[in-house]
Every structure is written in C-alpha cells, then in structure tokens.
Amino acid sequence: MFDIGVNLTSSQFEQDREQVVIRAKQAGVSGILITGTNAQESHQAMLLAQAYPDYCWSTAGVHPHDASQWNGDIAEQVHHMANAACVVAIGECGLDFNRNFSTPEEQERAFSAQLAIAAELSMPVFLHCRDAHPRFISLLTPWLGQLPAAVVHCFTGNRQELDACLAVGLTIGITGWVCDERRGLELRALLPHIPADRLLVETDAPYLLPRDLRPKPASRRNEPCYLPHIIRQIAEWRGEDATWLGQITDENARRIFRLA
C-alpha cells in the first residue's frame, strides 16, 4: 500500500520524523509521496525524499493558499527541483476558493504556470480543488493532453464533480475524510463509482486523522502508519478485499508516478 499524500515537512513531525517513517514501514506502507506546498517546503520535501531513497518521493509546487508568492524566481525553483530524480510530480497546485488566502486571480495564474511546467517536463500533476470545481476543470482540461497523469489529491466533492473528474481522465485520491461520520458520508457513497485503476489512497498526515480510528492516538496527529485502517474502511464500503485494494492502489501509484 502506498500513501500518496504525506506532509512530512510539517512542524508536527519535527521531533520524530524518523520514527514516523519507521512506523509506516512496520505497518506495511510500501512507499510515501511527500507533499510540497511552496518553494521552501518543496525543497525540504525533496531533501527528505533523498534521505529515504526508494521509499519516499516528493512533489514540487505551490499550493493555492501560497499562490500570491508565485513569480519568476519561484517558477525557476520549481522547474529546477522537478529535475531531481526523487521529485515525481508538480504540485500541490490548483484552486481553493473556500478561504482565498490568495486571490482567485493569483491562484489561477500560479495554477496555469505550474500546468505549463508539468507539460514542458512531461510530469504528472498533484492537484488541489476546493469550492472551485468548474473553474478548476476549465483551466486544467486544455493541458491534459500534454500531461502523463493528473491526480486530484484529497477528493471531497459530490457525484457531479466526481463524474466530471473521471470524464477527463483524472485519478482520485481518497483520504481518511471518508471515515468521518459527520462530513464523509456523501463521499463514502461515491466510493463504488471510482474505477479501481483510477483510485489512490492517502492519509494527508498530519491532518485528517480518521475519526473512527480506535484507539485514538493521544496526539490527535495523523500518520502514514494509519493508512491500513483507511484502506480497510474503503475496501469495506466498496465491497472489495482490503489486501487486494492495498495492492492495486500501490500499483496505481507506482504506475502514475513512474516509480517502477
């Protein structure tokens, strides 16, 4: 099983990153994709991936929250980092019109620029979309023919949005959000509609600790070692064997991010 979304650069892991990776391995997690969300954290993610060769890889990009930082120098840094062997996708990039920490115009500019970098380098994109689906799809679609793959990280949308993502060929990342009985029920009902070869799994650690995890960790911090729990729950709600689902989603991740 492969965790495609871990924020291992987070300060929440500052005291015990090595142990977090060890616990993930002990839990049966076969690989981790470390998320880059701005130039500085993308560089940190790259260094962490290099510290765990053949187990950790990373993305390089600028999250929509940080899109106001986007300029030529940042673009050059992302382009340069993308040439590292351990950097396997451009992102986390996209649109987030929920909080608008950067203006919609700044977000669209940074998103389009990162899609152009990914197309130039023929790299997959690691995508973020929140409360921006129509504009997200309209900006992304013209680039899809030039991209080897596009992954919607932490998908939490509705059936119409899922169908639209699948229709243009996107791969869907599912987190422990689906384990939340308060806000994950709609997403849970959509799980059987995601083709197995288009499904990826992720913790988004240290965020989104599964609410149905027992016993709950005292820290309330999510970790990649909890990925098996998420996979078991997804498999149950899809009517599939958990071991098989862990294997197929692992194969999907390795194919999409070209880790073979």
Curated annotation (Swiss-Prot):
Asked whether the keyword Nuclease is assigned, the reply is yes
Q: What class of enzyme is it?
A: hydrolase
- Specify whether Nuclease is a keyword of the entry: yes
Pfam families, alphabetically? TatD_DNase
Cofactor(s) named in the record: Mg(2+)
Q: Which SUPFAM superfamilies match?
A: Metallo-dependent hydrolases
- Give the record's GO CC terms: cytosol
Location in or out of the cell: Cytoplasm
Q: Which GO terms describe its molecular function?
A: 3'-5'-RNA exonuclease activity; magnesium ion binding; single-stranded DNA 3'-5' DNA exonuclease activity
Residues that coordinate or bind a divalent metal cation: 92, 128, 153
**Superkingdom as given in the UniProt entry:** Bacteria
Q: Provide the function of this protein.
A: 3'-5' exonuclease that prefers single-stranded DNA and RNA. May play a role in the H(2)O(2)-induced DNA damage repair.
The similarity comment for this entry is: Belongs to the metallo-dependent hydrolases superfamily. TatD-type hydrolase family. TatD subfamily.
Query: What protein is this chain from?
Result: 3'-5' ssDNA/RNA exonuclease TatD
From the broadest rank down, the organism's phylogenetic lineage runs: Bacteria, Pseudomonadati, Pseudomonadota, Gammaproteobacteria, Enterobacterales
Protein's gene: tatD
